[in-house]
């Protein structure tokens, strides 16, 4: 167990936001399928899995994204794999949405009595607990929070097998939204862009990792 803990912490220390990748080194198909699987298996609020992982390997499409993604100027042309993580919009994640009903029945395979109670609880949760029905943006931001769980798991899993990564929020939302909509990737308003992440192998070693002291970020009560 001690060895496993050491291996996990080694992966966390290995991981850094890689700004430029070696374009000659590619992540194997099996390794990348493993990374994607850790995203797919990630937890989400109410188990709704409000995400889609769009793997962008087409160089022309990457260049189109690059024009409006200031945070990935070096990553887009050099990463072995580049992923757009989409989050479901209010259209799909409001308590009475068809997506939720279908997900509960077909994916979670809930019995009818459980299903009805779950829908009722979801309405209560969204309406009164977290006040998520204030706007469509509030619901989308809630869904986007879930995608960051998958994002973190994918980057950690990648680090554990020696693959580098970089999370990217540095993009012009309106332009990226337009491009994805034109490509039909937002599925008639069911999705929108949440975050991006690049994977590959570092071209150079980073400077030593720095973090706040434990006593500055942890409080016991």
Swiss-Prot record:
Ligand binding (NAD(+)): 157-162
EC top class, as a word: oxidoreductase
Domain of life per record: Bacteria
Keywords: Flavoprotein, FMN, NAD, NADP, Oxidoreductase
InterPro entries per record: NfsB-like (IPR033878), Nitroreductase (IPR029479), Nitroreductase-like (IPR000415), Nitroreductase/BluB (IPR050627)
Cofactor(s) in the UniProt record: FMN
GO terms classed as biological process: 2,4,6-trinitrotoluene catabolic process
Disulfide bonds: none
SUPFAM superfamilies for the chain: FMN-dependent nitroreductase-like
Enzyme Commission code: 1.-.-.-
Keyword NAD: yes
An example molecular function term from Gene Ontology annotations: oxidoreductase activity
Gene Ontology CC: one annotated term: cytosol
Binding site for FMN: 15-17, 73-75, 169-170, 211
Family per similarity comment: Belongs to the nitroreductase family.
Record note on quaternary structure: Monomer.
This protein's name: Putative NAD(P)H nitroreductase YfkO
């Amino acid at each position: 167990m001690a060895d496993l803990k050491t291996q996990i912490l080694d992966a966390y220390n290995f991981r850094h936001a890689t700004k430029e990748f070696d374009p000659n080194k590619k992540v194997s198909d099996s390794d990348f399928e493993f990374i994607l699987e850790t995203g797919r298996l990630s937890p989400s609020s109410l188990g709704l899995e409000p995400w889609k992982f769009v793997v962008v390997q087409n160089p022309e499409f990457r260049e189109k994204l690059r024009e409006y993604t200031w945070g990935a100027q070096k990553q887009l042309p050099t990463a072995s794999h580049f992923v757009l993580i989409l989050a479901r919009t209010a259209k799909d994640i409001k308590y009475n949405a068809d997506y939720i009903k279908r997900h509960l029945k077909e994916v979670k395979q809930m019995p009818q009595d459980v299903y009805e109670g779950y829908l009722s609880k979801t309405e209560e949760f969204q309406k009164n607990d977290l006040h998520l029905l204030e706007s469509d943006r509030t619901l989308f931001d809630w869904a986007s929070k879930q995608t960051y769980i998958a994002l973190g798991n994918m980057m950690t899993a990648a680090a554990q097998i020696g693959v580098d990564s970089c999370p990217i929020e540095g993009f012009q939302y309106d332009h990226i939204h337009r491009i994805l909509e034109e490509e039909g990737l937002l599925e008639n308003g069911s999705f929108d862009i949440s975050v991006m992440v690049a994977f590959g192998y570092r071209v150079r070693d980073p400077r030593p990792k720095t973090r706040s002291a434990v006593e500055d970020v942890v409080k016991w009560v």
